[in-house]
Each structure stands twice: as C-alpha cells, then as structure tokens.
Design a protein with these regions (language model features):
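Core catalytic alpha/beta fold that binds nucleotide/phospho-ligands
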Residues: 1-205
C-alpha cells in the first residue's frame, strides 16, 4: 500500500534570525498588514521562517515560547499539530476539565506527570484542529482510546480512524502530530539549533 509523506518541520527560537518579511505568502502579508505588531513577535518570526523552508502546502501550524511546528504534505491530508511549553500546572484540576475519566485514571499512573499530561493535551489540541472542532469545549470528546487502561488509539468524537505521534522536544516542549487514515509516513525536519536527538520520548498510536 502506498503511503503519503507528512512532513513535520520543527524550529527553535534561534530560527527567528531567518525570518524574511519579503518572502511572506499573500495570506500572511495581509494578516501582517492588518496587525503590524506581529512582526516583532518571536513566535511569528520563527513560524513564518519555517513556512518559507518548503514549497509544500501547509496543513497545520503551531507555536509556543519561540518554538514552532509545521505540518505539510504533497497532497491533501486531514492532519493537525500542536506544540506546548511544559510548565508546572495543577494537572489534577485541569485534567478534570478536559479529560475523560479513563484519561484521568491513566494520568494518575504516570511516572512523568507533566510530560504525560502535555503529550495528551497536544494530542487533544491537534485532533481539534484536524477535525475542525471547538476549543476548549470539545477537549473531552477527543483524545485516547483505551484497552486495559493503556492508550491504543485516538478518537475525535465518534471517529476512531485517527493516528498520531507525540514527543518531547529539547526537554522543554511537548508536541503531537495527528492524521486521519493509516497510510501516512511522518518525516521530521529540524531547523535553528535543533537536532534529531532533541526529539525524545516518541510515542506513536
């Protein structure tokens, strides 16, 4: 069976130096004209510099704390990406708001509570983007499918034909890529000072 490549481009704050205002696409140029202060934001600079590294159509984009993740593919795909800075939070209270009971029970058993929570959170946000659902109201309706207490799949509403990979980036960021349908090969590209070994704890579902 033929597979479709899905490219995930990753960049850290140092990649802001590669931002080129003159190379913005039409949509980003219009957005910048409406909100000029965006040009001074590191997230904008890094994410738009990342978009300028490929001629493939962008499928999904996420940025946080100067890091950015871009999904692109040579043909139309239903996919989404989310990247988040790992910071201390009241995970028990937050999971009660956005997680099913099964997900909450799973999080209670985690050896690395913050990383495990954020990888689930990133899966949820990426699924919401890909399935065109609403944040935050649909957070409980997306997430893990369980078997014997362990995540074995992903769901968005009643749809379970979702797949994805989550990881930790540079020890400070969590990210997740999701796609609909199995015939996809995820390929990573690194920019700025990032290297392949900065991507750890990869989990594919």
């Amino acid at each position: 069976m033929d597979t479709t490549p899905l490219h995930c481009l990753l960049a850290d704050p140092s990649f802001a130096a590669c931002y080129d205002h003159a190379s913005l696409n039409a949509a980003d140029s219009q957005r910048l004209a409406a909100t000029p202060q965006l040009a001074q934001r590191q997230d904008w600079q890094v994410s738009r510099a990342l978009k300028q590294q490929t001629d493939l159509p962008a499928v999904s984009l996420s940025h946080s704390q100067g890091f950015a993740a871009l999904l692109c593919a040579p043909q139309p795909l239903t996919a989404g990406v989310d990247i988040e800075f790992i910071r201390p939070r009241d995970f028990k209270a937050l999971s009660a708001l956005v997680c099913t009971q099964e997900e909450q029970d799973f999080l209670k058993t985690a050896n690395c509570p913050s990383e495990t929570f954020y990888q689930l959170w990133c899966f949820k946000e990426a699924l919401i983007k890909a399935a065109n659902l609403d944040f935050p109201s649909d957070m409980k309706s997306v997430g893990y499918v369980f078997d014997s207490g362990q995540p074995v799949g992903l769901r968005a509403g009643k749809q379970t034909d979702w797949y994805g990979t989550s990881a930790i980036l540079a020890d400070t960021m969590a990210l997740a890529c999701v796609w609909k349908g199995k015939a996809v090969t995820l390929q990573w590209q690194f920019f700025g000072s990032l290297k392949p070994n900065d991507l750890t704890d990869r989990q594919t579902i």
